[in-house]
Amino acid sequence: MASIHRPKRGSLAFSPRKRAKSHIPRFRAWPEATGEPKLQSFAGYKVGMTHVIMVDDTKNSLTQGMEISVPVTVIETPAIRVAAIRAYAEDSTGEKAIAEVWAADLDPELKRRIPIPAAGNQAEALENIGKLIEEGRVSDVRAVIYTLPKSLTGVPKKVPDIMESGISARDLGTKFEYSKTILGTLVSVTDVFKNGTLVDTAAITIGKGTQGPVKRWGIQLMKGKHSRQGSLRQVGTLGAFNPSRVSWRVPQMGQMGYHQRTEFNKRILKIGSDGEEVTPEGGFINYGLVRGDYILIKGSVPGPSKRLIRLRDPIRAKKADLGEPNILYISRESKQG
């Protein structure tokens, strides 16, 4: 007799499976500070995938020291601008912003996203945050940053994507002093990350709209005569007679895709400034040409091409720093078949 036990179809880990609130993913935590002061996150736009030939530098790997083919994701990373500094205080309900100061000269495209605060006395606002830090009322200092997609030819938008980034520093005073130096300035990806380091990626996955329970949850098709009674791709039962309600655990049709997903410890294989080094013949499908700064991430990244990808210092770094990888070849063969 066949076994009646089997793994449960689908997973409740990501319930409720509904659309993300925004196309901009969120980081809800920041790693502990190490090294020199810098931003702890960056943002770019997904271009597509290709592959590289590199020397395997994984310790104790069967192919250590040999040439291997590795799939990579290309992310175009134009410079971002620091729009504001924000100070947080912690109370019984969590952290809340208690003071902020905005840069004076911001890009006019930012008005398409948010109403820019009126120009105030920047020196007075900075002095106020400094006093709050001295009084011990500030729990954290973060930076408000935004992207500049108008410089990209593959992303047909001018409206910046605005988000918040943590600042890596050993104490609040150092964080605040560093944030004052970058307020209103452009920050490039090389100021935040370097070749060979690990990062966490966050993005909104490809949206697939409304799908049935077979595709959405992976349940089996009806078998035998049950499939001939008008319900081939439906769940066998919605539940017991009592309790007289349908549990949220029952696999049913609904939204699939367009969810936020965060992946840990993705390795940066290369950071470059010449897009021709990675652009294939005829350009990337659904994107086009890479013209500016870019990074190569080992493996895949959630989301379609042109989707905003956020990068953060690893919050659960387990691997030692492998150093800069030795890349021998980057495939530029046409992706159009």
From Swiss-Prot:
Keyword Secreted attached: no
GO terms of biological process kind: translation
Cellular component terms (Gene Ontology): cytosolic large ribosomal subunit
Keywords recorded for this protein, A-Z: Ribonucleoprotein, Ribosomal protein, RNA-binding, rRNA-binding
Any Pfam family matching the protein: Ribosomal_L3
GO molecular function terms listed in the Swiss-Prot or TrEMBL record: RNA binding; rRNA binding; structural constituent of ribosome
Residue span of region Disordered: 1-20
Recorded family membership: Belongs to the universal ribosomal protein uL3 family.
Subunit structure: Part of the 50S ribosomal subunit. Forms a cluster with proteins L14 and L24e.
Record function comment: One of the primary rRNA binding proteins, it binds directly near the 3'-end of the 23S rRNA, where it nucleates assembly of the 50S subunit.
Protein name, UniProt field: Large ribosomal subunit protein uL3
Species per Swiss-Prot/TrEMBL record: Methanosarcina acetivorans (strain ATCC 35395 / DSM 2834 / JCM 12185 / C2A)
Name of the gene encoding the protein in the UniProt record: rpl3
